[in-house]
């Protein structure tokens, strides 16, 4: 057993497979637990561009919520094209940029979807009108530690949203291994935010379904595998959402991969779709085709849920654009520290534009451990491919939650990650199971078998790129023009199907790029950015049920 470091974490792991000698050995399929990897939740929080910190929470007071959610957010993330002239402290360089504007810089509203707004964006209004809302189904959420105000926070959220409240008839919490020693363990480890997100948004999607929260006693992989086994043994529901990850496929060893897969396989064999988030870091710098397939989402018996962004279409008001979740950032102008005595800051137009990096995107990739299952025979490569499907995950186009800190309830805005995508998709699957009247089983092969259009394919469109930001910089050498793609030099991997929007406030100008998920790119049919696509309304529900008959 050796010590390793990965993604800034230290852990121990065995470098050789463990063997059990003696007669008992033939009764043991897997030895796990020799390593100290821990499972981590996959939520992310958007930063306020003005402060570079998470958005300030809003206290849930009677005054703030007298008419429902306080008016501090809007799903209108983009606004009409404008032209900005940039001038720093020196005469040159100067710049002129034209294109779509990131609306918060104009409106001062947080770009977020409230429950009714996201329901509408996902085509669920027609689903509910058809009498479908998950009734008769149970959604299982797999979490760690728990926290004391989970139900209270959720009901505060649902009251604001006008959704059915939780009670003993539609909600329960179980602790298969007993409650943690400290009731605040979930708060201290950050699992409270994860649990709030999963509960509040799975119920938003399928408000008629019951919800059972299965709480693991710790963060070790064995704790979660035991939780999945408990779900299978007790047939708690036809769908389970798991918004967490242990490691990437290339780091986790075969023993750990096998132990996860066996637990998931048993649940799948009992008709349960075990859905997992795929991660929030794109290909983690590993490129394609391998990428960064996550454990446990890479199990061929799991359904791997990746991420999308949902943006308003400035060319067609009332419509939305769905892209792969992949946020890139380019700085056009800001303050540059001058190494003088004393140091000073000079407002500087960047020449050329300064690529500031990748700020998050849906995970995925090809397994080097699991071969392709039969239902992925038409896909590239030799290994299990992820994701299978995607849903909203971008924290920049995120959602709010209600959470309690220091005995005060707050609304937190800008929450996302594939931690959001998994409960959204699981809510859809509960509605599909309701419509079917029987358990549809694992979602991944069912989605792979759908005729084209059954799940909404995420593709690059003209509307998506029409008003992307372009610019011209003037310096001592003359004028240099920059196309939308040239502004994102180094970030595209050949991908031209993205949306960009400019953010400009005094002292700062930048461009957001949406749909740039590291080396992953969208294309017709399955792709490593969004899988087969994203569920949308009755078209998805009806297609799944019709194809299963």
State what each model feature region is.
Residues 310-313, 403-404, 434:
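Short regulatory "switch" loops immediately downstream of catalytic or recognition motifs
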Residues 167-170, 341, 346, 468, ...:
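N-linked glycosylation sites
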Residues 1-307, 352-416, 422, 438-442, ...:
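Substrate-binding/charge-relay-adjacent region of secreted/lumenal peptidase catalytic domains
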Residues 426-434:
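Short glycine/serine- and small hydrophobic-enriched flexible loop segments
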Residues 300, 304-362:
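Polar, glycine-rich mid-to-C-terminal structural blocks
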Residues 433-524:
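An often Trp-containing, charged/polar helix-loop segment at the C-terminal end
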Residues 43-64, 312-337, 452-492:
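Internal, charge-rich low-complexity segments
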């Amino acid at each position: 057993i050796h010590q390793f470091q990965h993604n800034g974490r230290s852990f121990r792991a065995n470098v050789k497979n463990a063997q059990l000698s003696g007669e008992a050995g033939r009764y043991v399929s897997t030895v796990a637990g020799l390593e100290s990897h821990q499972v981590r939740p996959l939520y992310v929080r958007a930063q306020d561009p003005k402060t570079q910190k998470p958005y300030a929470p809003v206290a849930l007071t009677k005054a703030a919520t007298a008419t429902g959610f306080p008016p501090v957010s809007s799903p209108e993330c983009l606004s009409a094209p404008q032209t900005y002239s940039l001038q720093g402290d020196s005469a040159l360089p100067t710049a002129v940029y034209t294109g779509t504007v990131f609306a918060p810089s104009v409106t001062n509203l947080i770009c977020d979807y409230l429950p009714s707004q996201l329901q509408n964006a996902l085509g669920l209004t027609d689903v509910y009108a058809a009498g479908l809302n998950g009734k008769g189904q149970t959604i299982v959420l797999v979490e760690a530690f728990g926290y004391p105000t989970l139900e209270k926070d959720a009901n505060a959220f649902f009251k604001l949203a006008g959704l059915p409240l939780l009670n003993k008839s539609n909600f329960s919490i179980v602790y298969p291994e007993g409650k943690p020693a400290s009731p605040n363990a979930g708060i201290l480890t950050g699992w409270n935010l994860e649990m709030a997100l999963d509960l509040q948004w799975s119920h938003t999607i399928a408000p008629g379904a019951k919800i059972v929260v299965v709480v693991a006693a710790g963060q070790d992989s064995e704790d979660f595998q035991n939780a999945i086994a408990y779900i299978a043994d007790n047939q708690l529901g036809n769908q389970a959402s798991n918004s967490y990850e242990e490691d990437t496929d290339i780091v986790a060893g075969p023993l750990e991969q096998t132990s996860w897969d066996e637990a998931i396989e048993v649940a799948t064999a009992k008709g349960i779709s075990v859905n997992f988030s795929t991660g929030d870091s794109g290909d983690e710098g590993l490129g394609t085709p391998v990428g960064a397939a996550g454990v446990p989402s890479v199990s061929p018996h799991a359904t791997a849920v990746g991420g999308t962004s949902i943006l308003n279409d400035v060319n067609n008001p009332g419509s939305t654009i769905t892209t792969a979740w992949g946020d890139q950032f380019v700085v056009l102008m800001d303050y540059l520290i001058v190494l003088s005595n004393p140091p000073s800051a000079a407002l500087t137009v960047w020449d050329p534009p300064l690529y500031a990096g990748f700020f998050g995107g849906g995970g995925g990739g090809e397994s080097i451990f699991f071969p392709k299952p039969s239902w992925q025979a038409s896909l590239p490569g030799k290994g299990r491919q992820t994701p299978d499907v995607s849903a909203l995950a971008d924290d920049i186009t995120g959602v709010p939650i209600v959470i309690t800190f220091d005995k005060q309830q707050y609304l937190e805005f800008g929450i996302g990650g594939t931690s959001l995508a998994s409960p959204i998709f699981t809510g859809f699957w509960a509605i599909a199971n309701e419509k079917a009247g029987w358990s549809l089983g694992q979602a991944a092969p069912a989605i792979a078998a759908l005729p084209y259009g059954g799940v909404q394919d995420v593709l690059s469109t003209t509307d998506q790129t029409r008003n992307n930001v372009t610019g011209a910089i003037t310096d001592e050498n003359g004028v240099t023009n920059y196309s939308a793609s040239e502004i994102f030099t180094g970030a595209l991997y050949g991908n031209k199907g993205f949306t960009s929007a400019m953010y400009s406030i005094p002292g700062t100008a930048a461009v957001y790029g949406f749909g740039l998920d590291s080396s992953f790119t969208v294309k017709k049919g399955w792709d490593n950015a969004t899988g087969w696509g994203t569920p949308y309304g009755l078209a998805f529900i009806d297609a799944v049920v019709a194809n299963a008959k």
